[in-house]
Amino acid sequence: RGVISAIGDGPLQVGITGNRVGPEHGFGHIMGWYHEEPVLLIKASQGNRSIGWDFYPPGSPQYVVGDMTYAGYGETPNKWLTTDTNPTPVTWYAGKQYDECFLDESDWAPAGAGFDAVTNAADVLANFDTLYPDWAAQGYEIAGFVWWQGHKDHTDGVYAPRYEQNLVNLIQSLRTDFNAPNAPFVVASIGFGGGAVGDKPANYQLVHNGQMAVGDPAQYPGFAGTVKSVNTLPYWRTL
């Protein structure tokens, strides 16, 4: 459910992180070959999640589209008629997946107070010395982030056009929450179906182009040299 389900201390291989693997295996080996220092991967993932709702970054505001109000960070439900002054809450809130993946429970939005504690990235780092005693004296550095997500956002006509700004906010939030203001940040684009982005539906293009935009120093000079976008469309393969 988007939290740390297995913790391994050893060479990256099948079985070291439980009975499931993902793109961290290919990525991790490349990082290990490139760097002389030991590399620790902390993976938090969950499918079918949007930045517009599930990963809505802390501080993200409420907004209105048509006659609907959309939740700000920590609010529930995801949307309601603006004329409704007392919308009925649901068992989820804007940004809950962000909280569960990245923040200590004490830093969760107030709406998260009734949810069970989880083991997440914040816990791994807080217990680094215990989990990785061989490296306790050396400590750790947040050397970078990788973000690969976006498919769910493109299925929503409100979230898709807001994706780029939400991604900017997410990059800034993660750097702030992990005290790594200049850590490199790699964004992998959505790539379902492969082919050319110009042949995709309009909302797909909005998300994809937003992902590519944040890595363009002409559009985001504040990210120049620290944010890189990678187009994954050419790597799609049909099994």
PLM features: what roles do these ranges have?
Residues 1-239:
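Cell-envelope and extracellular/periplasmic
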